[in-house]
Structures are given as C-alpha cells and as structure tokens.
C-alpha cells in the first residue's frame, strides 16, 4: 500500500519520480482499509526537505499510511514559506485530542542550548507526555531523541568539543530485535550533531536497550519499551547529499568523516545507508501494525495485539 499525503504537497512529485507509490485522497477513500495514522512533528529548519525524506521511508511499506504534518503551536517557522506551513501543517494544539498509531519527532538545531532554554520546551514536554496517552508508538530523531531521554529518564546531553559529522560504521548489538530485522552487522549511518548522550548515563532498570552504537560516536538507536518509543540519535533518513550540503553551507570546515570518496569533496558521495533506513522504518511500521488496536480510539488504553499476523509479508499475503 502507498502513503497518503496532500495532493499538492511538494514531496509528491519527488516521491513519484523515485517510484514511491503515492495515493491521492480520492483513491484512499475507495479502499475499505483503516490506514495507519502517522504524525510528523517537524522541528527542522528545512521542513520541505525533511518531510520528503521521512515520507519516502514511511511510504515504502506494503501498508497504507496516512501522514499528518504537525508543528509546534506557537513557534513560527523562519525558513519555510508561511503559505506552505498554513496549507500543510496543523498546530499540535489542534491534533492533541486525536490519536495516532505512530508519531515521529525530528531533530532541531538547538543542541547548544540547555533543554529548558529552548523556546518551545514546555510545549514539547506536553507533546512527549501526550504520546503516552494518544500515540501507540513514537520515533524520535537526533535532538528530539536527546530531549525524550532527558524528559522521561533524566539522561543528560553533553556538548562535544567538535561536531560529530560524517558517515560512521555502527555495530548491531541486538540482531534479534524486531526493529533490526534484516540489518547487517555493521551498518553505516550519517551523523551530524554537536551533542551526545553517553551509555554510562543510561539508568539501570530503565528498560532502555541500545540497539545500535558506534565506537566513534556512541549510542545510535535505543529501544524504550516503557514509553513505546525508539530514539535515533543520528540521521538514517538523510538524502545522499545531505551531509555534503551541510559541509558546503557551513563554509567548508572539517570534512564529514568517511563520506566523500577519497575524502575529495569534488567527488559525489555514495549512499551506503539507504537500505538500512528503509529496513528500520519498515520494521517500525510493521511492529505498529502488529500491535496497534484496530479501533484507533482504543489507543492509550493498552497495547492489545489486535493485528498480530506476523511480519508485513504475512499480513499482506
């Protein structure tokens, strides 16, 4: 099944050119299927690029996904046209009484600030608490993952002396995890951040499990079953040229490690993480499908395995 997004969202023609099946609203109405409702709280400055990256991954599974774009209620986006925000994004205050099968919260370029000094921190805390009563499963990315670890578990973030920047080899620490089904032993994942969380700070007894880590950049992906969340500190969703664009945008500082062939920025980078990005989001969507209530109104009242038909292949068979 395809992803259902607004007919005139800029991501649509890009995804269609890539072969992602994008459903028009009129077609979706004719299918007697309850789509998985996925919300995307987009905190990134370039919202159009980010929504395209994530829609690409969410739309690549056999299940029909209905994507709702969400923004912070009072925060005004400065890098995305106001007409785009008005046309495609709903403030969180408007959706807070609704329920979602999945909810993605992106990173934001505010790592240098203490959490409490971020202008929308109080509302983000309310959003995180709301996911525990109105969302079946959450997926936080980069700064949002650091924020969730701090909010739910008191885990601090640590500023780095230099930006962790590049394409780094990671270790698969939990090959039996349903979220890492199909993963290789050493996936490469893009990293771009000025702060980190440390394995030593993860509280004993928290139930947090580190699924992926890197010897160079630390924890990458944590499973948080107590809060029905995955926390991804890096950027598996990035486009092939995302790190290159950051490098040239920032005045050509240190090269992104392990990214340009031969460390030559004149040579086009190769995408060595796309397959794992699709696997991770596909596995997450599959776990949502297997465990979310068929009646979306029941989300928040438990986690009954209403659709426990096994992996997507069995469900779609």
From Swiss-Prot:
It comes from the Bacteria. One of its GO terms (molecular function) is homoserine O-acetyltransferase activity. GO terms for cellular component: cytoplasm. Transfers an acetyl group from acetyl-CoA to L-homoserine, forming acetyl-L-homoserine. Pathway: Amino-acid biosynthesis; L-methionine biosynthesis via de novo pathway; O-acetyl-L-homoserine from L-homoserine: step 1/1. It comes from Rhizorhabdus wittichii (strain DSM 6014 / CCUG 31198 / JCM 15750 / NBRC 105917 / EY 4224 / RW1) (Sphingomonas wittichii). InterPro entries: Class_I_gatase-like, HST_MetA, MetA_family. Its main location: cytoplasm. It is found in: Cytoplasm. SUPFAM superfamilies: Class I glutamine amidotransferase-like. This is Homoserine O-acetyltransferase. It catalyses: L-homoserine + acetyl-CoA = O-acetyl-L-homoserine + CoA. Gene3D superfamilies: 3.40.50.880. Its EC number is 2.3.1.31. The keyword Amino-acid biosynthesis applies. The record marks 111 as: Important for acyl-CoA specificity. The active site is at residues 142, 235, 237. The record marks 192 as: Important for substrate specificity. GO terms for biological process: L-methionine biosynthetic process from homoserine via O-succinyl-L-homoserine and cystathionine. Substrate binds at residues 163, 192, 249. It is an enzyme of class 2 (transferase). Belongs to the MetA family. The lineage of its organism: Bacteria, Pseudomonadati, Pseudomonadota, Alphaproteobacteria, Sphingomonadales. Keywords: Acyltransferase, Amino-acid biosynthesis, Cytoplasm, Methionine biosynthesis, Transferase.
């Amino acid at each position: 099944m395809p992803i259902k997004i607004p007919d005139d969202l800029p991501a649509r023609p890009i995804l269609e050119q890539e072969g992602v099946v994008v459903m028009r609203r009129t077609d979706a109405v004719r299918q007697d299927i309850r789509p998985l409702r996925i919300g995307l709280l987009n905190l990134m400055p370039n919202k159009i690029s980010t929504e395209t990256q994530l829609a690409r991954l969410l739309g690549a599974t056999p299940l029909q996904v209905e994507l709702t774009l969400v923004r912070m209620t009072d925060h005004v986006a400065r890098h995305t046209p106001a007409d785009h925000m008005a046309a495609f994004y709903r403030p969180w205050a408007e959706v807070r009484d609704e329920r979602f099968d999945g909810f993605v919260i992106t990173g934001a370029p505010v790592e240098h600030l203490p959490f409490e000094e971020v202008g929308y921190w109080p509302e983000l805390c309310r959003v995180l608490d709301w996911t525990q009563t109105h969302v079946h499963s959450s997926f936080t990315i980069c700064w949002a993952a650091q924020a969730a670890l701090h909010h739910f578990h008191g885990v601090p973030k640590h500023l780095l002396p230099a930006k962790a920047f590049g394409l780094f080899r990671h270790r698969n620490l939990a090959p039996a995890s349903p979220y890492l089904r199909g993963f290789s032993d050493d996936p490469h994942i893009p990293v771009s951040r000025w702060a980190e969380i440390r394995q030593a700070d993860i509280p004993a007894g928290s139930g947090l499990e580190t699924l992926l880590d890197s010897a160079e950049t630390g924890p990458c992906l944590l499973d948080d079953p107590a809060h029905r969340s995955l926390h991804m500190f890096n950027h598996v969703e990035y486009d092939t040229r995302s790190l290159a664009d950051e490098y040239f945008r920032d005045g050509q500082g240190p090269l992104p490690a392990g990214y340009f062939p031969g460390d030559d920025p004149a040579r086009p980078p190769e995408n060595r993480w796309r397959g794992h990005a699709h696997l991770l989001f596909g596995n997450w969507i599959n776990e949502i499908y297997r465990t979310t209530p068929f009646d979306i109104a029941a989300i928040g009242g438990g986690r009954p395995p209403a659709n426990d038909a096994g992996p997507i292949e069995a469900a779609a068979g």
